[in-house]
């Protein structure tokens, strides 16, 4: 898998390579340092050994192509949000973002991450949420019910136009007394956060994005 995996679905580095005017790889593996360089997706020379090492890891450097992108300056805010999401999903992985243009550094290091099925996953709304048809939050209601059986009854009796139903498993975590890492690892808390839509934390929380103005 090491030889064929290039990231998510095995295409990550391949796509970056194709969209870059230059991409340089430095790989520390099995006691050797390997290097290779590409220009607009084409290898400039075969993978070669340039030294010895007692560490492991890969450094990828790339320069976006002006032929493809009209804007090649990276947005630190976008990168910071994405890396923060990745740090939640990958417990124990330390991610460092440095912007050397302004001497800025962000460090993301969560001891307890989130599973891929957690509701903080960016995939979309929780699967058990029976959403309403109304798109205006001021006219939308969210009903929180305990258990799938109660959720089924509530879904049958609701007004589909304006009433959404979200079944939750059992008693939800008391977040007022819980540590932050325990809170975000709770599947039910994550489900609720995603359904409400306004995010969490000082950087991400935005009450204007609340999807329902009435929560019962």
From Swiss-Prot:
Span of the signal peptide: none
Keywords from the UniProt entry: ATP-binding, Cytoplasm, DNA-binding, Isomerase, Nucleotide-binding, Topoisomerase
GO MF term (any one): DNA binding
Top-rank EC class of the record's enzyme: isomerase
EC annotation from Swiss-Prot or TrEMBL: 5.6.2.2
InterPro entries for the chain: HATPase_C_sf (IPR036890), Topo_IIA (IPR001241), Topo_IIA-like_dom_sf (IPR013760), Topo_IIA_B (IPR000565), Topo_IIA_B_C (IPR013759), TopoIIA_CS (IPR018522), TOPRIM_dom (IPR006171)
Catalysis: reaction(s): ATP-dependent breakage, passage and rejoining of double-stranded DNA
Matching SUPFAM superfamilies: ATPase domain of HSP90 chaperone/DNA topoisomerase II/histidine kinase, Type II DNA topoisomerase
Location in or out of the cell: Cytoplasm
Listed GO CC annotations: cytoplasm
Pfam families: Toprim
A GO BP entry: DNA topological change
Site (Interaction with DNA): 171, 174
Main location group: cytoplasm
Keyword Isomerase recorded: yes
Domain Toprim: 140-216
Keyword Iron belongs to the record: no
Subunit structure: Heterotetramer, composed of two GyrA and two GyrB chains. In the heterotetramer, GyrA contains the active site tyrosine that forms a transient covalent intermediate with DNA, while GyrB binds cofactors and catalyzes ATP hydrolysis.
Function recorded in the entry: A type II topoisomerase that negatively supercoils closed circular double-stranded (ds) DNA in an ATP-dependent manner to modulate DNA topology and maintain chromosomes in an underwound state. Negative supercoiling favors strand separation, and DNA replication, transcription, recombination and repair, all of which involve strand separation. Also able to catalyze the interconversion of other topological isomers of dsDNA rings, including catenanes and knotted rings. Type II topoisomerases break and join 2 DNA strands simultaneously in an ATP-dependent manner.
Miscellaneous field: Few gyrases are as efficient as E.coli at forming negative supercoils. Not all organisms have 2 type II topoisomerases; in organisms with a single type II topoisomerase this enzyme also has to decatenate newly replicated chromosomes.
Protein family membership: Belongs to the type II topoisomerase GyrB family.
Protein name per UniProt: DNA gyrase subunit B
Organism of provenance: Acinetobacter venetianus (strain ATCC 31012 / DSM 23050 / BCRC 14357 / CCUG 45561 / CIP 110063 / KCTC 2702 / LMG 19082 / RAG-1)
């Amino acid at each position: 898998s090491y030889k064929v995996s290039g990231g998510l679905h095995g295409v990550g580095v391949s796509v970056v390579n194709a969209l870059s005017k230059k991409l340089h790889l430095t790989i520390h593996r099995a006691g050797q340092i390997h290097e290779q360089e590409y220009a607009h997706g084409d290898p400039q020379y075969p993978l070669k050994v340039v030294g010895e090492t007692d560490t492991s890891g890969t450094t990828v450097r790339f320069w976006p192509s002006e032929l493809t992108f009209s804007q090649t300056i990276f947005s630190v805010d976008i990168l910071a949000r994405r890396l923060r999401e990745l740090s939640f999903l990958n417990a124990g992985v330390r991610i460092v973002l440095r912007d050397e243009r302004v001497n800025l550094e962000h460090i993301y290091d969560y001891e307890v991450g989130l599973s891929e099925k957690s509701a903080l996953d960016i995939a979309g709304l929780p699967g058990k949420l029976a959403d309403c048809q109304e798109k205006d939050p001021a006219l939308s209601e969210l009903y929180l019910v305990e258990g799938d059986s109660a959720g089924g009854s509530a879904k049958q009796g609701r007004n589909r136009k304006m009433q959404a139903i979200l079944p939750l498993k059992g008693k939800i975590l008391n977040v007022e007394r819980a540590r932050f890492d325990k809170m975000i690892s709770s599947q039910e808390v994550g489900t609720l956060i995603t359904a409400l839509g306004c995010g969490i934390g000082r950087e991400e929380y935005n009450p204007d994005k609340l999807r329902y103005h009435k929560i019962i």
